Amino acid sequence: MSGAVATGGAQSAGLGAAAAGCCSSASGAGSAALLSGGSGIAGRLPSRVLEHIFSYLELMDLLNCSLVCWHWNNCLSDENSEVWRSLCARSLSDEAMRSDILCNLASYKGKLKSFQHALSSHDCSRNVYIKKNGFTLHRNPIAQSTDGARGKIGFSEGRHAWEIWWEGPLGTVAVIGIATKRAPMQCQGYVALLGSDDQSWGWNLVDNNLLHNGEVNGNFPQCNNAPKYQIGERIRVILDMDDKTLAFERGFEFLGVAFRGLPKTCLFPAVSAVYGNTEVTMVYLGRPLDG
């Protein structure tokens, strides 16, 4: 029996590889004609069979599969199906899945997408690292240094939202915002790194100043006696590349638009910190909900 199960698993994995190869070659005229419209063999496979095969594939293969035909797309449309659960289990750490880090993401597909957009371990200061959960930045206790990180993926169009929160002391400067690929992620001293040049835009949570091009662009939010940031409080960042604006929310309160007239270039979620051993978590949420 165990041999039969092993053989069945190997056959399913082989079918998964074949499906992935089929998807990657579907851009060819012959393959496209065979697979499109659900009229070929691909379109006649039962959903439960497709779901089993798809559970062996990686994210990019699944995204390609969703473009093959209506039947395959429909099979992958359930964002909490076994396909997405299986990929979540393989891709995300147990810590991330068990903790409340991803509590505002209802689907397995949403959790996977958030991981794809998390802070980058390859695009950050040498004085920070991304923890095993895949979402939290830890700043090492290095004196006289300001250290930051960018998200893995930047945006040049559309509307996007993500959450950021501190899980340790802020220190004298703690900035959240956006940056181009050219913005530095480390500098000497304790400064507001995001907003220190024309390549980044930031909100310093310590003094509520908006920063860009090395200048203070006023206080935020624009109200009397604005409350100070509390450790653990989730701030939602809303980037609208269609209207070229950056806005923030705290809890269920819209704080307003912080920056307007953003350039038509690729902008990345970013954060900078100065306090030793502090930690910052970022979770990409996708398209913001209006209202």
Swiss-Prot record:
One of its GO terms (cellular component) is synapse. PROSITE patterns: B302_SPRY (PS50188), FBOX (PS50181). InterPro entries: B30.2/SPRY, B30.2/SPRY_sf, ConA-like_dom_sf, F-box-like_dom_sf, F-box_dom, FBXO45-Fsn/SPSB_families, SPRY_dom, SPRY_FBXO45. Pfam families: F-box-like (PF12937), SPRY (PF00622). Residues 97-289 form the B30.2/SPRY domain. Pathway: Protein modification; protein ubiquitination. Keywords: Ubl conjugation pathway. Residues 39-87 form the F-box domain. One of its GO terms (biological process) is protein ubiquitination. Belongs to the FBXO45/Fsn family. Probable component of a E3 ubiquitin ligase complex. PANTHER family: F-BOX_SPRY DOMAIN-CONTAINING PROTEIN 1, SPRY DOMAIN CONTAINING SOCS BOX PROTEIN. This is F-box/SPRY domain-containing protein 1. It comes from Danio rerio (Zebrafish).
